[in-house]
């Protein structure tokens, strides 16, 4: 069973995670209260251009935080990666799951969003009724904003950007 993508939707004012996978489904709420799909989409649009730093969840990056993230993720934080990340000290930073966690208030990695899925199906089913759903694949997550586009915190060389879903394999 290979998980390809993930989506979000609202059900009675609750945000529900839905990783897309065939043919099984699993239901589990991710967040409740006043968080809406419209709010998630607006949040993502507002964060376009935000620097990507692996492990960041929307906080202002400091040297202390960067050092902690490097200790926690030594495989990612090579000397080259750290040299790129240090440029973002003093700015709000995020990684892919942090973009969503920043909005929901639930700090999670992309796999945690997968684990809290409500339903799974193939990305082939993506359509315009799914605006605001989060697209998931192993190790990465983004938010579908319609017309074949998503917003994703893509990587340290890209930051948070609008991408064609078809260009995000």
Question: PLM features: residue spans?
Answer:
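Loop/turn positions that initiate beta-strands
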Residues: 131-133
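Short, Lys/Arg-enriched N-terminal segments with co-localized hydrophobic residues
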Residues: 2-6, 12-32
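Short, well-structured active-site flanking segments
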Residues: 108-117
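Short, surface-exposed secondary-structure edge patches
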Residues: 120-129
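N-terminal capping segments
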Residues: 22-97, 101-106, 138-139, 151-157
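Catalytic Cys-His active-site segments of thiol-dependent hydrolases/isopeptidases
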Residues: 143-168
């Amino acid at each position: 069973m290979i998980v390809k993508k993930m989506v979000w939707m609202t059900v009675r004012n609750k945000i529900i995670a839905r990783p897309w996978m065939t043919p099984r489904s699993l239901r589990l709420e991710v967040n409740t209260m006043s968080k809406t799909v419209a709010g998630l989409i607006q949040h993502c649009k507002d964060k376009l251009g935000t620097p990507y730093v692996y492990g960041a969840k929307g906080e202002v990056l400091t040297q202390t935080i960067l050092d902690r993230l490097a200790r926690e993720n030594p495989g990612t934080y090579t000397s080259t990666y750290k040299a790129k990340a240090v440029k973002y000290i003093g700015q709000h930073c995020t990684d892919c799951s942090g973009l969503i966690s920043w909005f929901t208030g639930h700090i999670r990695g992309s796999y945690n969003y997968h684990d809290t899925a409500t339903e799974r199906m193939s990305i082939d089913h993506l359509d315009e009724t799914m605006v605001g759903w989060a697209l998931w694949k192993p190790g990465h997550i983004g938010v579908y904003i319609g017309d074949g586009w998503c917003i994703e915190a893509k990587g340290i060389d890209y930051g948070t950007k609008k991408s064609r879903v078809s260009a995000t394999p």
